[in-house]
Curated annotation (Swiss-Prot):
GO CC entries: plasma membrane
UniProt-listed InterPro entries: 4Fe4S_Fe-S-bd, 4Fe4S_Fe_S_CS, Cys_rich_dom, HdrC_iron-sulfur_subunit, Helical_ferredxn, NarG-like_domain, NarG-like_sf
Gene3D superfamilies for this protein: Alpha-helical ferredoxin, Transmembrane di-heme cytochromes, Chain C
EC number(s) reported in the record: 1.18.-.-
Main location: membrane
Protein name as catalogued: EtfAB:quinone oxidoreductase
Protein topology in the membrane: Multi-pass membrane protein
Biological-process GO terms, alphabetical: butyrate metabolic process
Binding, [4Fe-4S] cluster 2: C312, C386, C389, C392
Residue span(s) of domain 4Fe-4S ferredoxin-type: 293-324, 375-405
Species whose genome carries this gene: Syntrophomonas wolfei subsp. wolfei (strain DSM 2245B / Goettingen)
Role this protein plays: Oxidoreductase involved in syntrophic growth of S.wolfei with butyrate. Is presumed to link the electron flow from butyryl-CoA dehydrogenases to the membrane, in conjunction with the electron transfer flavoprotein EtfAB. May transfer electrons to the menaquinone pool of the membrane.
UniProt pathway annotation: Lipid metabolism; butanoate metabolism
Length: 714
């Protein structure tokens, strides 16, 4: 931010960039800079070596234009980071300020080597002003972030390390010394200036540098120049230290985040496909190196910001799972400890197992080569605690992919180790024998039509075989859960009233397989999908209405992996469309105060938030938005196959936690609603149980969106 003046005709002075003023042997800086740059490149190569150890296949070389745009939006615009108002914006200020200062330093270097006539006059004043202001915002940002971490101490930052403090101090020192240098230069310039115009240029170009200059006004010019030189070299030394430390500290996230933004999963929310499963020699992930390169990059990208932890329903109800610590950070520590032995085995051609017997490994306090990823590092409790709600992935500013890692480890536990909760084994058996996790005889799958008195409204394809526009995929809950059969009835009546042409497969419909897949039984999942695809294709299905959000996610996002490409809609999307088109006109607005629970699989997994709300408002519902709604919604506890697993209330660290569904129900009951409305059979079951546990059954009823709309139609 140093500029001088040269006289022009007419006596005017024009500001211009003067680099290296008052700095003898300034050229040495370019030689010294080779040291930190070399250290940085060495560190980057060591990171790359570790990522290349990955055995799993992850392909992220498609949609190049979209990836470049993602890199820009989330890296430079900080779109995901600023979701958290205070910390997010302070981080954005720090990033933008550092970025502009880095670019300015690069321009300085270029200006010093080649003539750059544009860095003078009004353009240069504007350039200097932008650098000065954004640099000061960065200084504010780092101070606020330090205050939050060390004085406010939010729970999400409960694993602060000593290195975090040193990094904050280093960044603070770089920024502060930069302004001291600028202030000293301006203070000296003021004393040496002969015109008010020159002083006016200084004030306009560097408002905060001018502020710092006021601190040094009483010093002599010689003292100013001496301190300017000393601080300049100190500033460059700590800046070079910063560069050298990047690959070896959490500063690495500056570059790792850019890679993660570029190579993030651009496909709709879906689990990873296992191709040629019958030929596979192993299933899932047993060792850290079995993951894909993007998974290992994820581990290096985590900055321990705690947003995943803050939003995780399992963590917030006292479970073993902490997506930040017991999952990502434990895996990262394990990878860091194991990588040297894996690299040595790769270099020598030795078997990985042999490295466990080396003297170096044996001398470790905990031999990383003998640690089990599933049992010692992550822990089976952590693996089974996850509800797949996607809150961690939704709020992670680095786009770390937590759920795929959990599911891969479950696959190994289930399909390779044969180690799973007994309730999961029972659900698998039920799905294998009767094609539904309830275990009710498959022959009665269409029985709900007669039970609810809507048989004549349904085109039962195996019997009627009429032409239809949509296939109604009712799912297991409508078929076998007594409470949810009423939802199926309401939906059928609404579709008929609107004149929608639809067919239903009855006993030729099978479980969607979502629970099987998310519990780790990929083979069973693919078997169920194959059976459904055969039925769909036999009847020429093109469009599908799905009742359950879990089935909706499977059919829409995951069935295409096996060739099942259809137009898939959740029923709330169809109802919202019918209401908007005037084909469903509620005649008896309810006028009821209600809270709405966002299903994780309809909301975070698929981005469907507004359509269910529009239906409820059309029905005359007074929808009260609670704090944890939409992207910030709290899981009911049944996702990820946990509908079929027992959950106990946890006593931990002297705190008695409630179950996930009870915790969520308490949130929904805060506004004292007359109704709690869901869009999912699992959610309805869990919230209804929560209302019962809260002894609020008399004052608050639990309904599904379809039921609410039908009530307003009757």
């Amino acid at each position: 931010m140093i500029f001088g003046f040269h006289p022009l005709e007419g006596g005017y002075d024009v500001p211009m960039r003067v680099v290296g003023a008052n700095i003898p042997y300034e050229w040495l800086i370019y030689v010294i800079m080779l040291i930190p740059v070399s250290v940085f490149l060495f560190g980057f190569w060591k990171k790359l070596e570790v990522w290349l150890l990955a055995k799993g296949e992850i392909h992220r070389n498609d949609k190049i234009a979209q990836r470049i745009w993602s890199w820009f939006v989330f890296s430079f615009a900080q779109a995901r980071v600023i979701r958290k108002p205070l910390a997010g914006w302070m981080h954005a200020f720090l990033f933008w300020g550092f970025l502009v200062l880095f670019l300015a330093a690069g321009i300085d270097a270029m200006h010093n080597m080649i003539s750059w006539p544009h860095l003078e006059g009004n353009f240069y004043i504007g350039f200097s002003w932008v650098v000065d202001v954004l640099g000061f915002l960065a200084l504010i940002g780092v101070m606020v972030l330090g205050f939050v971490r060390y004085f406010q101490k939010p729970e999400r930052l409960n694993d602060t390390k000593s290195s975090d403090g040193w990094i904050i101090l280093l960044i603070f020192a770089i920024l502060l010394t930069g302004y001291f240098i600028e202030g000293l230069r301006i203070a000296a310039q003021i004393k040496l200036s002969t015109t008010m115009q020159q002083i006016a240029y200084e004030r306009a170009a560097s408002p905060f540098g001018w502020m710092f200059a006021s601190f040094f006004g009483s010093m002599s010019v010689d003292a100013m120049l001496m301190w300017h030189r000393l601080l300049w070299w100190f500033h460059m030394a700590i800046a070079f230290l910063f560069i050298a430390l990047v690959p070896f500290t959490k500063l690495w996230h500056i570059f790792a985040s850019m890679l993660n933004y570029t190579f993030r999963d651009l496909e709709p929310s879906a689990n990873r496909m296992v191709y040629n499963i019958e030929e596979a020699e192993t299933f899932g992930v047993e060792n850290i190196e079995d993951f894909g390169w993007k998974d290992l990059l994820d581990l290096d990208s985590c900055i321990r910001c705690g947003r995943c932890q803050e939003n995780c329903p399992a963590y917030n109800t006292g479970k073993h799972l902490n997506p930040k610590i017991t999952l990502i950070q434990n895996m990262k520590a394990h990878l860091d400890a194991k990588a040297p032995y894996l690299l040595a085995a790769k270099a020598s051609g030795a078997e990985v197992e042999e490295m466990a017997m080396t003297e170096e490994a044996a001398a470790e306090e905990v031999n990383p080569m003998e640690q089990s990823l599933l049992y010692d590092v992550v822990g089976s409790e952590t693996i089974w605690d996850c509800t797949n709600c996607r809150a961690c992935m939704e709020h992670c500013p680095m786009f770390i992919e937590h759920i795929p890692k959990i599911v891969e480890m479950r696959r190994n536990l289930v399909m390779w180790q044969g180690d799973m909760p007994g309730e999961a084994q029972m659900a698998f058996t039920n799905m294998e024998r009767n094609y539904n996790p309830w275990g009710v005889g498959w022959a009665g799958r269409a029985g709900w039509l007669d039970e609810r008195g809507v048989r004549e409204m349904v085109n039962l394809l195996p019997e009627d075989g009429k032409e239809f526009e949509y296939l109604l995929y009712a799912g297991c809950a409508v078929s076998f859960d007594d409470r949810y059969k009423r939802v199926g009835e309401a939906l059928v009546r609404l579709l008929n009233k609107a004149g929608v042409s639809f067919g239903y497969l009855g006993t030729e419909e099978y479980c969607c397989g979502d629970s099987a897949r998310r519990l780790g039984n990929e083979y069973l999942y693919q078997t169920l999908v194959s059976q459904n695809l055969e039925s769909f294709n036999n009847y020429g299905v093109k469009k599908i209405i799905v009742v359950c959000p879990h089935g909706y996610t499977a059919l829409k996002n995951e069935y295409p992996q096996m060739g099942g490409n259809y137009e898939v809609y959740h029923y709330t999307e169809i109802l919202a469309k019918l209401v908007a088109e005037g084909k469903l006109k509620p005649s008896k607005p309810l006028g009821v105060k209600m809270t709405y629970h966002d299903s994780c699989f309809l909301g975070r997994h698929n981005g469907v938030y507004d359509q269910p709300r529009n239906v409820l408002k059309a029905a005359g519902g007074q929808v009260i938005e609670i704090e944890k709604a939409k992207e910030f919604g709290f899981c009911c506890g049944a996702g990820g196959g946990r509908m079929w697993l027992e959950e106990e209330a946890v006593l931990k660290d002297g705190i008695q936690y409630k179950r996930i569904n009870d915790t969520r129900t308490d949130q929904l009951l805060v506004p004292n609603p007359e109704m709690i409305v869901t869009n999912c059979p699992f959610c309805l079951t869990m919230i209804a149980d929560g209302v019962k546990a809260a002894e609020a059954e008399e004052s608050t009823k639990v309904f599904d969106v379809a039921e609410v709309l039908w009530k307003a139609m009757e």
